[in-house]
Amino acid sequence: MNQFLRFLPVFFALTLGACASNEPAATATTAPPGFVVGSITHETSNGSYRLGIAGKPGQRIREPSVGGGLLPFSNQTDDDLKEKGGTFELELPPGEYRIVRWSIRRGSTDTQSAQPFEISFTVESGKISYLGNLHFDPHWENVSLRDRASRDMPILLKRTPKLATLEVAYTIRKDANLERLGNGYKSRSDIPFIMPLPAR
C-alpha cells in the first residue's frame, strides 16, 4: 500500500501532462486587410501604367495598374474620370507602406522612374487609404501625385459598393501636387537578340 501511495503523485503528473498535450493549439488571428485606393491617368498612348507599393523589407512590391491595351491608339478614356486611365483598389494587411516607383509596360518595353522615391502611408484594418491620382504628362518628365479625392472617391464608391460603409484612415494631403516623381525615366527592352546564321 505504501509503495502504491509513493507512485501516486507521478501517476497524476503523467495524467495531467497527457491531458494538456491533447488540448487544441490556439490559432493566431489575422486582422482583416485594409483597402488602398486611388487613380492613375495619363496623356499618352496606351500601355499598362503602374504604381509601385513597398511594405516591409523583403516583401514583394505590389503594383496596382490601369490600361494594358495592345492597340496603341484604341480609346482608353475613362468615362467617369474624363481622362485616359482608371481607378484601382488593392487589399493589403495593416501596416506601414511606401510608394517607391512608377512604371509603364508597352509591348516588350518597360519604363520606370529614373530614381527611387518614398511617399509613406498607413493601412488600417477594415479602413480605406486614398493615395491620390498618379498622373503621367505627355513626355513622362513630370509624373505627379495629386489630390483628386473629390473626383475619385465618388467613382470608387460607385464601382466598389463595399467601400461605402468603411472609414477613411489615410488620404493624401488636401490639394497636394507632388511633381517630378522619380526625376525622369529609364527604359529597358525585352526584345531577344537573335544570332544570325552564317551564310552557306
Indicate where each model-derived feature is located.
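Primarily secretory-pathway and cell-envelope proteins
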Residues: 19-73, 104-200
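Short, acidic Ser/Thr/Gly-rich low-complexity loop/linker segments typical of extracellular
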Residues: 68-84
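Sec-dependent bacterial lipoprotein signal peptides
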Residues: 1-19
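Short, surface-exposed beta-strand/beta-hairpin micro-motifs centered on an aromatic residue
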Residues: 84-91
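Short consensus segments that form the blades of beta-propeller domains
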Residues: 79, 88, 109-111
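A short tyrosine-centered beta-strand micro-motif
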Residues: 93-101
